[in-house]
Regions:
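Short, conserved DNA-binding cores of transcription-related domains
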Residues: 1-81, 85-89, 166
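RNase H-like nuclease fold core
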Residues: 74-79, 87-92, 125-126, 131-225, ...
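Acidic/histidine-rich catalytic cores and adjacent linkers
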Residues: 1-4, 35, 43, 107, ...
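DNA-recognition alpha helix
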Residues: 113-124
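Short, amphipathic alpha-helical "recognition" segments used to contact nucleic acids or chromatin
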Residues: 97-109
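Conserved beta-strand -> loop -> alpha-helix junction used to position metal-binding or nucleic-acid-contacting
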Residues: 223-230, 235-271
Length: 400
């Protein structure tokens, strides 16, 4: 006689076990709620007692997500006494923690679909896209408060740049420009100063952006570092008249390369770098003149003109401590931030409007600012302080 083979459906068994555990958790939690209510009223349900502190008035149901699944709590209603159960308090703390976790996952670049999968794995139930959307609205309020926070202290070095994103408006795609500023404070630490939507990178947009930063408390600006955008130099002079402007040398090189034949790119690169390898501003100017002459001899008239017209704006950094030169003559710090922004925005694709684009950019900036990026000293400012003391001493001698 052949033996009967019993086949087991593993998924069904797992489901039955999960439901058994979930039911046990639900029953245990509700028993704890009843016990808490008895303790508060100092009497069991329907019990007559002189020590009774309150009376029961039915229940209300409340859902709770646990690692075993969704359970329903039958919370006792009490009259004559406030029922603040420890279980509900833990639920509130957990609810807040879950919200914070979901927001952080979103800000860290995790897609909505991935957030749903993660919540199901962690808590036994999926968080719906509408819930994530509501949490993002909550995050937006926090991000706006951060974006508009008052700026305290002084920021000698300010780096600015524009980030272009796409928005879909009525079926047509157009650029959205987000202007970003990062400052180095007097203690040498970096801080994201702000971001604002600009219709385009022109004088009006930059002027509005700088005035907004100044209105929030930005002061002590001595050098503004950025690419040569339309109207930026004029806007810097009007809003921060005491500040100097440093054109990013990397962007300057790229601009020269646009009119340089591929076969001569390497030679031109070495020539440009030789200008900024000089130890003094005067030596750099002399080297630049020699480079312009050499480019003309190479029949690169357009490249020669770009160098001749733009070189002076790239030499401003020589007026500051030599220890800072490598970090204040380029916009590389902001370029790295922009890569982080684009990494997140690529997941989203296009935006319905400029406000949503600004929110996501600020969310990413805020996230990065809370990492090692914002807590690690970017540069020592002792050399700048020393330069100021020496200049102040020289001024005093001149007055004497």
């Amino acid at each position: 006689m052949s033996e009967k083979i019993v086949t087991l459906n593993e998924e069904v068994i797992k489901g039955e076990i999960r439901e058994l555990v979930r039911g046990s958790v639900e029953e245990t939690l509700n028993n704890l709620l009843e016990a808490e209510a008895d303790k508060l009223t100092q009497a069991r349900r329907y019990e007559r007692s002189e020590d009774r502190q309150g009376y029961r008035s039915g229940h209300y149901d409340r859902g709770l997500t646990t690692t075993s699944g969704e359970v329903t709590l039958h919370v006792p209603r009490l009259k004559g006494i406030s029922f603040e159960t420890a279980i509900i308090e833990r639920y509130r703390r957990r609810e807040s923690s879950v919200e914070e976790t979901l927001i952080e996952m979103y800000l860290a670049g995790v897609s909505v679909r991935r957030v749903e999968d993660i919540t199901e794995a962690l808590w036994g139930s999926r968080v719906s896209p509408s819930t994530i959307s509501e949490l993002n609205k909550k995050a937006y309020v926090n991000i706006e408060n951060w974006r508009k926070r008052p700026l305290t202290g002084r920021y000698p070095y300010v780096y600015v740049d524009g980030v272009y994103l796409k928005r879909n408006w009525g079926g047509e795609y157009e650029n959205v420009s987000i202007l970003v500023a990062v400052g180095v404070a007097e203690d040498g630490y970096r801080e994201v100063l702000g971001a604002q939507e600009g219709m385009k990178e022109d004088k009006a947009s930059w002027q509005s952006f700088f005035q907004w930063l100044k209105g929030r408390g930005l002061e002590g600006v001595r050098l503004v570092v950025g690419d040569k955008c339309l109207g930026m130099l004029e806007a810097v002079g009007e809003v921060f008249p005491e500040a100097k402007y440093q054109r990013c040398i990397v962007h300057f090189y790229r601009n020269v390369f646009t009119v340089t034949p591929r076969g001569k790119m390497r030679d031109v690169t070495h020539m440009l770098k030789a200008i900024h390898a000089q130890e003094t501003q005067e030596a750099a100017r002399e080297k630049a003149q020699a480079v312009v002459q050499k480019l003309r001899e190479m029949r690169l008239k357009e490249a020669a003109k770009k160098v001749e017209d733009g070189i002076e704006e790239t030499l401003t950094y020589y007026a500051f401590p030599s220890k800072h030169w490598l970090k204040i003559r380029t916009n590389n710090m902001l370029e790295r931030l922009n890569r982080e922004i684009r990494r997140r925005t690529r997941v989203v694709g296009t935006f319905p409007d400029g406000e949503s684009a600004l929110m996501l950019v600020c969310a990413r900036l805020r996230h990065v600012a809370g990492t090692q990026w914002g807590v690690k000293r970017y540069m020592s400012m002792k050399s700048l302080e020393q330069m100021d003391r020496e200049k102040h001493g020289a001024d005093c001698c001149d007055l004497a």
